[in-house]
Amino acid sequence: MGFGQVVIGPPGSGKTVYCNGMSQFLQSIGRKVSIINLDPSNENIPYEPAVNIQELIDFQTVVNETDLGPNGGLIFCMEYLEKNLDWLKEKLLPLKDHYIIFDCPGQVELYTHYKIISNILDNIMKWSFRLTVIQVFDSFYCKNPSNFISILLVSLSGMVRIELPHINVLSKMDLIEQNGPLDFNLDFYTDVLDLKYLDAFLDKDPRLKKYSKLNKAIAGVIEDFSLVSFIPLNIMDKKSVANLIASIDKSNGYIYGSLDTNTAILEIQERETQWNFDKYQETQEKYYKSYEDDDVIFENDQDEDYDEFSKYLNR
């Protein structure tokens, strides 16, 4: 049984940086990790992929020979992979004892309008891999209410169309207030609290006023499903990464892979309860310059707390 992550999200959200950083962190705590590059247009790969779709099909050749644009060429490449899954299976099966990270393309339509990625993942699951989909979004989108609603809609669409455990991530948390303070506390964005509070901010901007009814209708759909939430992440902060890994391991079952007795499950549940107490309070205090308690100061390196996570992650 293999375990891993499928990393998706819009262009510029930091997927490849996430894959590279996550791989380094997991290797540092003793896991064997392999990254699978499924993005045929990814020209600057900072890691050494164990499997690379570019060995199967060349994106630039497709674009030149078919006269397709970038998006059309990418869809062509992914459809070609879907028709040649035996190639992928042959590459993946020897890696079952590795923790697998799939670096996927950033074109949103692959997840919202096509079944290509979903079909590929369905087949990978049949090969005895247990996966969690990680949707990565730039925390910059929290700054604008309309942009925030758009990533909520993309998140919901991906969760509905790809039938796997999902975790949505707000990346680049260290830069979240680079363009000014946010309108709400962090938990409003991570837990997707009452979106009606966004109405006043949507009506403020004259450019968005004509879309006010549309935005409110979309917000209503998101609240009706009540599926979307986010985990904040700074990939350079080991405590932040460890928090995310704890959630991922629970969602795909990795956390239970080494259990010998039923009592160990109770120990894990107790530990999860302790970790989830005010789980994002520290992140808010650390990265929100406008946070109301200005006297609270946290050091970047919290080795004592991190050791507790390491004990769990090395199980």
Swiss-Prot record:
Organism field: Dictyostelium discoideum
Keyword presence, Secreted: no
Assembly and binders: Heterodimers with gpn1 or gpn3. Binds to RNA polymerase II (RNAPII).
Residue span of motif Gly-Pro-Asn (GPN)-loop: 69-71
Family: Belongs to the GPN-loop GTPase family.
Alphabetical list of CDD domains matching this protein: GPN2
Function comment: Small GTPase required for proper localization of RNA polymerase II and III (RNAPII and RNAPIII). May act at an RNAP assembly step prior to nuclear import.
InterPro entries from the UniProt entry: Gpn (IPR004130), Gpn2 (IPR030231), P-loop_NTPase (IPR027417)
KW GTP-binding (keyword) present: yes
Key words, A-Z: GTP-binding, Hydrolase, Nucleotide-binding
UniProt site (Stabilizes the phosphate intermediate): N71
GO molecular function: GTP binding; GTPase activity
Full protein name: GPN-loop GTPase 2 homolog
Binding site for GTP: G12, S13, G14, K15, T16, V17, S171, K172, M173, D174
